[in-house]
């Protein structure tokens, strides 16, 4: 086979978005080595432009038919395009939030960008991984870069502690997940492509075997750790509290998107004849995540820990769409994931901005902030209320679509739990807003008293202010434009043969 024929057979055009991010990563390293600090002022815009270019190329591939790439190792279907877009969008917003934070910490901005882009590459590859080798390599790429990002503030003891905890728990969860995949590798007779593994296991009559059950349990546990679902969530609040806030912002959405993409592809492909079983397992995970995440969040005094437990509950909400297992379920998961990016990153952006001025993330220290910076309080309130699902904000319509799809699929108890815990979440979100808008001067915290008001000007927007504006606009406008977003999500599911085959199989098993 000639070289050009080999390149053509690999269908590398499907990996062009990842290629752009890789070239961007190397380019940033070369610029830093060549110019050092002389280009620090405009270094921020290089990854932003590169990531936006990658997003444009990615969107142009949406709805394509020839999706397999790299000899079947990568699946560039519309489902993977959606999740890869989410990861790129998360990275763009996090870069906007990080510049001032990293500069204040007197650490290298280039190192932060390189580690973040490496995590982006790992997450994007994981979203389309189609065989065991690609799953392992992309999982470790995402994991290792995330551990390094968590410990990025080398002189901060809390950051170091968070990195060690994340490393140990992440390594354990990866081992558990890989052990489950290795069982399937053995049952299939040595196949590595996930569709071939499923076919071989069914042909050999091992789809209901004890080993398949064990593999399902191990894979479920591994995925539960990756998306911070209860009861495998213990690492999340500690890591969220100790890590640099821009890193936490990315982990809360980017890693969750990659984990959900992996869960959707593995569960619908590898366990088509254990659908009822994995549905039951994930119903338990979703219920525990929504209940424990929201109940424990009530008692938190740290803003980052509160959002950490909130992230656990959000994983439970997202699982409702996965469990529904029909086009509306999958599309509701995609819609809510997109909305969650804006809501959650908007909240973290406000925490970063306040922390830069006040140097604290304790909820009580936000007391009276409305008197000093009413616009920041407004943006923070919009993000929190949207996370709580208050109409007419985007979070309300996202949860409504999720609950409707779950109800239509017959998961009534799960929907009731989601509704009940959403009310609980509104309570602790409103508690934060109440603290910020106290009007009595004597109730104002000492940190707010020292707080210097930021001048918000459209003509002189700082990157973090632009990031906050985009997130708040997303949280508001996405509620107005929710119908077009739902239509795009439904088309994404329609263009993904994997999800269509899964639905047909579920109907066959039901009847």
UniProtKB/Swiss-Prot annotation:
Catalytic reactions of this protein: a plastoquinone + NADH + (n+1) H(+)(in) = a plastoquinol + NAD(+) + n H(+)(out); a plastoquinone + NADPH + (n+1) H(+)(in) = a plastoquinol + NADP(+) + n H(+)(out)
Binding partners and assembly: NDH is composed of at least 16 different subunits, 5 of which are encoded in the nucleus.
Protein's job: NDH shuttles electrons from NAD(P)H:plastoquinone, via FMN and iron-sulfur (Fe-S) centers, to quinones in the photosynthetic chain and possibly in a chloroplast respiratory chain. The immediate electron acceptor for the enzyme in this species is believed to be plastoquinone. Couples the redox reaction to proton translocation, and thus conserves the redox energy in a proton gradient.
Family statement: Belongs to the complex I subunit 2 family.
Protein name: NAD(P)H-quinone oxidoreductase subunit 2, chloroplastic
Gene Ontology biological process terms from the UniProt entry: ATP synthesis coupled electron transport; photosynthesis, light reaction
InterPro entries documented for this protein: NADH-Q_OxRdtase_suN/2, ND/Mrp_TM, Ndh2_N
Transmembrane annotation, as ranges: 15-35, 39-59, 78-98, 108-128, 132-152, 167-187, 210-230, 244-264, 278-298, 306-326, 334-354, 377-397, 410-430, 466-486
Record's keyword terms, sorted: Chloroplast, Membrane, NAD, NADP, Plastid, Plastoquinone, Quinone, Thylakoid, Translocase, Transmembrane, Transmembrane helix, Transport
First-level EC class: translocase
UniProt feature coiled coil, ranges: none
GO cellular component: chloroplast thylakoid membrane
Single annotated GO MF: quinone binding
Domain of life: Eukaryota
Species name: Chlorokybus atmophyticus
EC nos: 7.1.1.-
Source taxonomy: Eukaryota, Viridiplantae, Streptophyta, Chlorokybophyceae, Chlorokybales
Membrane topology category: Multi-pass membrane protein
PANTHER family per record: NADH DEHYDROGENASE
Compartment list: Plastid, Chloroplast thylakoid membrane
